[in-house]
Each structure stands twice: as structure tokens, then as C-alpha cells.
Amino acid sequence: MGAGGRMSVPPPPKKLESEVLKRVPHSKPPFTLGQLKKAIPPHCFQRSVLRSFSYVVYDLTVAFIFYYIATNYFHLLPQPLSYVAWPIYWALQGCVLTGVWVIAHECGHHAFSDYQLLDDIVGLVLHSCLLVPYFSWKHSHRRHHSNTASLERDEVFVPKKKSSIRWFSKYLNNPPGRLFTLTITLTLGWPLYLAFNVSGRPYDRFACHYDPYGPIYTDRERTEIYISDAGVLAVTFGLYRLAAAKGLAWVICVYGVPLLIVNAFLVMITYLQHTHPSIPHYDSSEWDWLRGALATVDRDYGILNKVFHNITDTHVAHHLFSTMPHYHAMEATKAIKPILGEYYQFDGTPFYKAMWREAKECIYVEADDGDESKGVYWYNKKF
């Protein structure tokens, strides 16, 4: 969902699964970042305050309409219908608020406007309302963009080598175990990452997004971590007061369950962008920024592509040019695809099927036996 028009690109012809899973090239590409930038129309790099705010206003208006209908009319429904109405509200509100999350993420990339302070204020407010420590995540996410697909320095969804996987992993490599793992990942994955750095880069000591003195941050970033914590605490206190006034069940139904859906979509989207049998990871002997940025996948979420402001199907372009606003990313993707060629990876597999397949196929990474490129690692599932 979004305000104003947006260029749409017809989806590419549907590939056979064997083509989708075919490994992308891992050698140094025959093009440069500068050549890719020249192929993109200059206006795609322009950020408009009014246009960016129009998406904020649109999303928040839709979210308010859903909230108003739920809180003013659902109690009038016969009980069987209310059992249907609330799950519909949770799903719709969760999707819309995921779009709000994406806009706040864009603020963290300085892609919302030409004014860094404005971007940070908008991002802080929106992310805090979704219980996200804005600056804390902004800084760790920036390092993810600087080190994508590096086994040593990437910040999140860092795959394990075969020698590092836990002993119980092979016992979870079956349908019931996979369902259990995915359920935990989608429901608890985001808060566990923020609080305990689960699935994040290993540090030499405890790492937490709420700790200003943790190893994730530098001395000059610590004040902003305090600000992020204050934002989350302020919203948490507001929710406490709401629960005291309206009841805990009201807060859970109106806010809590949609937030769980936001968190689940966030984990799913980022997991599928960086986890695929066709894309490589690199150790320090092979990694470079451009190849790392290209080790990402554009996905198709159907109508949700629009609701999520195309973060799902323009992620390759986003990793190459992260300060580009989302409303130009489709046009930019269309412009660079002919240059990227086989280095561009798109997978139109429905996201629910892709999530199951990747959980099955992408257990750990290892280098190919006999390959001269010992620093290039591919996903594997064989124990």
C-alpha cells in the first residue's frame, strides 16, 4: 500500500525450479558499481519529503481505519463472526504495520529525505511505536550492508559452517522438527536477535541491541543507543497505561497480535532475502563488497510487495544503493537487470513454500571439494 503512483515491472517469466536453484556466478563481476549507477535514471536517487511522508500518512490512515473498525464494531458482531473478524484484523493490521516498519527502516538508511535529522526523528518515532530500538538497529543494520555475505563480519543470518552446527540440528531436519524451528524463528526470532544476538555475528562477549556499551557499538554511538532505549521504554510504559485502562486482553488484541505478525514478516522477509541454495557466502580470502551485495535474492510476495513498499522484490537494488527511496527501486531494478545478467537472482516461489524449502535445504555452508575458490561457501543439508 502506498500513496501516489509507482512504476510497476512485469514479473519475469516463471523459471523452472532447477533454474531458480542454479548457482549464481561467484567470480568477480565484469561490471562495476559505477556502471550500474550510470544505468539508473538520475531521478531515482532523488528523495522527496512530500512523497515520502505521503506513504507514512497513507499507511497510518489505513492502520487507523482498521483499528477504528475493530474497536467500534467487532463487539457488535455475533460471537461466531467475531472469531473470524479478529484474525482478519490481525492479518491486515500486521501487514500494514510491516509497511510502516519498512518506512522506518528507510529512514535509517537516509533514504526518506535529504535531511538526516528529519529521517532520524521519523524513524525513531515509527520504530519506537513498534518496539524497535531505532538507532541501535540502524547502526547494526548499516554494518550488515557493509559486510553482506561475509562469514566473519556480516551482522545477521550468518550461516554456520558444517563444523559449527549444533549436535541436535540433524534431529530437527525432518518435517516436525522443521515446523518447530520455523515456529520459534517466526515468533521469537526478532526479539531474541535484539536481546541476545541470536543468529547474529559472534562477538567475544555478550551482545545486545539495548546495551550502549555492548560490542556492537562504538563510543560515539552510545548516546543514540540510550535514546533508542528511551523510545522503546516510553512506548512500553504507554502500553502499560493502556492495559491498566482498557485491559490486557484489549492491548493484546488491538496491538500485540499485529505486532507479532510484523515481527514474523520481518524475520521471514530478511531470511528469504539472504538465504537461498543459489547464493554464496565468502570468507575473508574471497569476500568483497560488490559480490557480497549481489548475494541477495529478490522475492515475490504478490500484492504484499506493494504493502511492504517493494522491499521484497527490489532488495538487490536496495543493497547496491541503500539511500535510494523505495518508490524508485522498481525502476532502478529494471534498469540494472540487463547489466547484472546471471548475477541477478529472482525467485518467484510463493514465500510460504520458499520458507519451508530454504529451512530444509539451507542447513549449513561449506566450500566445494576440489574447488580452487576455497573461500566460497554454499548451502548444504547433508549430515
Curated annotation (Swiss-Prot):
Motif Histidine box-2, residue numbers: 141-145
Q: Which reactions is this enzyme annotated as catalysing?
A: (9Z)-octadecenoyl-CoA + 2 Fe(II)-[cytochrome b5] + O2 + 2 H(+) = (9Z,12Z)-octadecadienoyl-CoA + 2 Fe(III)-[cytochrome b5] + 2 H2O; (9Z)-hexadecenoyl-CoA + 2 Fe(II)-[cytochrome b5] + O2 + 2 H(+) = (9Z,12Z)-hexadecadienoyl-CoA + 2 Fe(III)-[cytochrome b5] + 2 H2O
| Keyword Lipid metabolism annotated | yes
Where do we find the motif Histidine box-1 here? 105-109
Q: What is this protein called?
A: Delta(12)-fatty-acid desaturase FAD2
| Keyword Cytoplasm assigned | no
Q: What is known of its domains?
A: The histidine box domains may contain the active site and/or be involved in metal ion binding.
One GO term under biological process is: unsaturated fatty acid biosynthetic process
State the GO CC annotations: endoplasmic reticulum membrane
Tell me the gene name. FAD2
Q: Motif Histidine box-3: list the residue ranges.
A: 315-319
The main location class comes to: endoplasmic reticulum
Identify which top EC class this enzyme belongs to. Answer: oxidoreductase
Q: Which UniProt keywords apply?
A: Endoplasmic reticulum, Fatty acid biosynthesis, Fatty acid metabolism, Lipid biosynthesis, Lipid metabolism, Membrane, Oxidoreductase, Transmembrane, Transmembrane helix
The organism named in the record is Vernicia fordii
**Similarity section:** Belongs to the fatty acid desaturase type 1 family.
> Which stretches are annotated as coiled coil?
none
Which Pfam families does the UniProt entry name for this protein? DUF3474, FA_desaturase
E.C. number, please?
1.14.19.6
